[in-house]
Amino acid sequence: MGLLLLLTALPARAQNLQFEPEVDAHLNLNSTFRTYLQAKDDRDGGDSTQFAIGQSLELYLKPLLKLKKLKTHDLDDSKSRFLVLEVGYRYLDIPDSPSENRMITAVTLNLPVVAGFHASDRNRADLDWKAGKFTYRYRNRLTFERTFAIHSYHLIPYIAAEPYYESQYSKWSTTSLFAGCIFPVGKHVEFNTYYQHDNNTGKHPNMPEQYVGLALYLFFSLEKK
C-alpha cells in the first residue's frame, strides 16, 4: 500500500526515464568497522551525468536485539546498528567539465517501528571541490522498509524520501522520492532495484527527472561467523 501511495503521488507528466547503475563492495574489518568501495553513475541531487568512485569507512555500535531480529534476512548488517558513522571520499569524473573531489560525512540512525517495519534516518554532508571552488550540500534520507517472505525466500521492499540543501543555490533545491525492493541472493550478494523521481528547483525552470536504478551490493567479512 505504501508503494502505491508513493507512486500515485508522483507528478503525472512523464519525463525521459534514465538508468542508474551502481556497484558497492563491503568488507567488515571487525564487529565495529566496515569499509566499502562504491562505483556508480551519480546524478544525485540533480547533478548532470557523472561517474563517481571512492571508498568509505563506517563505524557502528553493537546491534540492537530488536533490529537484529528484524534484519535477519538482510545481508547489510549496518541496518541492525542503532548508530552508524561514515566518512568517505569520491572522485567525480564529469564529461566536458573539470573533475570534482568530494568528502562525505554521514550519521545514520536505525530504529524498529510498528508492524515489523524498519526506519533509517541518514544525515549526510557532501563537501565538494571543483576547479578551485568549494560548495557543499546537506541531504537527509528517510527510509521505511519491511521484509516479506515468499515461501522460503525473503525480499525487502522500501520507500524513501531525500531532500537536498545546496549551498550554490542557498535553498532546499531537490527532493528525491524512491520506491524499490532489495533482493538477497545467497550469503554475499544483494540486488537493489528502484524507481526514483527527482524534483529539481535549483535552476529555472524546474527540472523533474525520473530514473530506474539497479545496484549490486557485495558483502564480505574478515571475521569468521
What does each of the following model-derived ranges do?
Residues 110, 118-163:
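Detector for outer-membrane/organellar transmembrane beta-barrel domains
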Residues 17-19, 49-53, 99-103, 134-140, ...:
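Residues that define the transmembrane beta-barrel architecture of outer-membrane proteins
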Residues 27, 59-61, 76-78, 109-111, ...:
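Residue-level signature of outer-membrane beta-barrel architecture
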Residues 39-45, 89-95, 111, 125-129, ...:
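Transmembrane beta-strands of outer-membrane beta-barrel pores
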Residues 15-82:
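Start-of-domain marker
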Residues 58-64, 107, 208-225:
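Outer-membrane beta-barrel "beta-signal"
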Residues 23, 53-55, 105-107, 140-144, ...:
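Membrane-embedded beta-strands of outer-membrane beta-barrel proteins
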Residues 31-37, 62-68, 82-85, 114-119, ...:
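Repeated loop/turn-to-beta-strand initiation elements of outer-membrane beta-barrel proteins
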